[in-house]
């Protein structure tokens, strides 16, 4: 089976808690290689553009405000079934519903401050990766 790529963002709440290393360990233990990574402070324009699919939703402004509230860690993960595997280790969007041992169950505070973002499909993964990374920035691992 071919290896997939997926995008992951460690959100401002998890960066502020200094749990980046713990989250990276979970990726690697699940067989997901980190092939690109950067820490950045998103601008309002970047956050609005990235989450444009949610623009008409009532939570859009709060989501954008949260995503620009502090630095984020953005990474590309590579592995067998990377999209599904990453979503499994992230846990449910609402940390109260997330399975024990998932990233959100262990590190998220609320449905808004929920520690991580992960692509939900291969198509969205390709779009999201291209939003943050040039092809030459992805390492072959």
Swiss-Prot record:
Pfam family, one: NDK
Major localization class: cytoplasm
SUBUNIT field: Homotetramer.
Cysteines paired by S-S bonds: none
Record-annotated active site: 117 (pros-phosphohistidine intermediate)
Recorded family membership: Belongs to the NDK family.
NCBIfam families noted in UniProt: PRK00668.1
Residues involved in ATP binding: 11, 59, 87, 93, 104, 114
SUPFAM superfamilies: Nucleoside diphosphate kinase, NDK
InterPro entries, sorted: NDK-like_dom (IPR034907), NDK-like_dom_sf (IPR036850), Nucleoside_diP_kinase (IPR001564), Nucleoside_diP_kinase_AS (IPR023005)
Protein name from the UniProt record: Nucleoside diphosphate kinase
SMART domains: NDK
UniProt GO cellular component terms: cytoplasm
Keyword ATP-binding: yes
Protein's job: Major role in the synthesis of nucleoside triphosphates other than ATP. The ATP gamma phosphate is transferred to the NDP beta phosphate via a ping-pong mechanism, using a phosphorylated active-site intermediate.
Reactions catalysed, as given in the entry: a 2'-deoxyribonucleoside 5'-diphosphate + ATP = a 2'-deoxyribonucleoside 5'-triphosphate + ADP; a ribonucleoside 5'-diphosphate + ATP = a ribonucleoside 5'-triphosphate + ADP
Key words, A-Z: ATP-binding, Cytoplasm, Kinase, Magnesium, Metal-binding, Nucleotide metabolism, Nucleotide-binding, Phosphoprotein, Transferase
């Amino acid at each position: 089976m071919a290896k997939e790529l997926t995008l992951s963002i460690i959100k401002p709440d998890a960066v502020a808690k200094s749990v980046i290393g713990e989250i990276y360990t979970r990726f690697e233990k699940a067989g997901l290689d980190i092939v690109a990574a950067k820490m950045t402070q998103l601008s309002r324009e970047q956050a609005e553009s990235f989450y444009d699919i949610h623009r008409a939703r009532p939570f859009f402004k709060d989501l954008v405000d949260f995503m620009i509230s502090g630095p984020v860690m953005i990474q590309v993960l590579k592995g067998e079934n990377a999209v599904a595997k990453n979503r499994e280790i992230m846990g449910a969007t609402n940390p109260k519903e997330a399975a024990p041992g998932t990233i959100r169950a262990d590190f998220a505070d609320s449905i808004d401050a929920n520690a991580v973002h992960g692509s939900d499909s291969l198509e969205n993964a390709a779009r999201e990766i291209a939003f943050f990374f040039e092809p030459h920035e992805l390492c072959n691992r």
